[in-house]
Amino acid sequence: MINTIIADDEPIIRNGIKDIVDWHSLGFRLTGTAKDGMDALKYIEQEEIHVVITDIRMPFLDGLELIKIVKKLHPDIYCILLTSYAEFEYAKQAINLGAYSYIIKPIDVDEFQKTLSNIKEDFEKCSRRKQYISKLELYIRQLEDFQNQNLFSHQKSD
């Protein structure tokens, strides 16, 4: 499951996002919500989170600052930025900070689900790649051990 958190200062938006998607059927687990960027950051420090869905304008720590910090600490976390503002400057900043997607409110459910499906596909691809790399590293260590054992036994017999 892909662990996800929603950060938005408006409870009606947080609850609406929770309810518009069948998270489980898409392969996601909504692990929590946060009322602002600071709460989200605290939550991310305590839990293994893969996706952050955040509003752009929130008290204490806005969505852009949250993404900036999250990407610095956890570059693999996917960030979706939600906003009521269709301003190009916000979109540009979001992209420069490494946001995966920039969605304008009110949320188009189909667009939102497509974004989540794309994240799932990318997440699974990255997970398979990491597993493959781990297997290769293990195989290389085993080959090195085998080579060292053969070298050691060959030297002993001389």
Regions found by a protein language model. Name each.
Residues 8, 55:
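Active-site residues of response regulator receiver
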Residues 11-32:
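Two-component/phosphorelay signaling modules centered on CheY-like receiver
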Residues 36-39, 62-65, 83:
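Acidic catalytic/metal-coordinating carboxylates
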Residues 58:
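Receiver (REC) domain active-site loop signature in two-component systems and cognate sites
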Residues 33-51:
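Acidic, metal-coordinating helix/loop segments flanking the phosphotransfer/catalytic sites
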Residues 42-43, 64-75:
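Short amphipathic alpha-helix used as the core "switch/output" element in two-component signaling
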Residues 107-158:
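Interdomain helical linkers/hinges and coiled-coil/dimerization scaffolds
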